[in-house]
Amino acid sequence: MPLMFRADEETKTLRFPFDFEFTSVFTLDGHTLHHEVHVKNCGDENMRCGIGFHPGFNIPFDENHTTTDYEIRFEQEESPIILDCLPHGLLSGKSFYQWKNTQAIPLTDTLFDNDSFCLAGLRSKTIGIYEKNSERKIICDISEYPYTLLWSAPTKPMRFICIEPWQSLPAAETDTSEWNEHAAAACIAPNESYSITLHTTFER
């Protein structure tokens, strides 16, 4: 199922000052959902951009489970670097360790009381939501993404969790408003395209 969004005068004035086409294509193959994203530069100058996905998953999986029956699990042990984000979403320039030498992050209803966790430095190719007492899990392939954001609304009990693979980062607090000076995952030449896919597998 393809969905396309085209830049218009409003987006170029208020949001992103480039002429582009953004296409999302969803394909289901067995238990795996493939979400392809294609960005075309329709303008006459180079366009810098970075793609970040924002999938969210309901938990618990059924009414017989609660938040603590689940954990975020990496493919291997990790000591992720947490990139500190300010309340308005910009990077503060600070980083810290929240977990060290762990393969699993237990879910609790207070985990996201202080907002999200932007993970960097991961070696794992996958990260997922695992139900501890069953084979049910949701696994995201993050092998093409250097950053992964974990986030949920601070509601109790937790009703969903987002696993967001990113190819680039938000702007830093000290960045200027000039788009071409921001860090980006891709620089697309005029009439060229950039594509990336997120693979998510649902198992039970």
Where do the PLM segments sit?
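Coil-to-beta-strand transition motifs
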Residues: 17-21, 28-34, 44-46, 65, ...
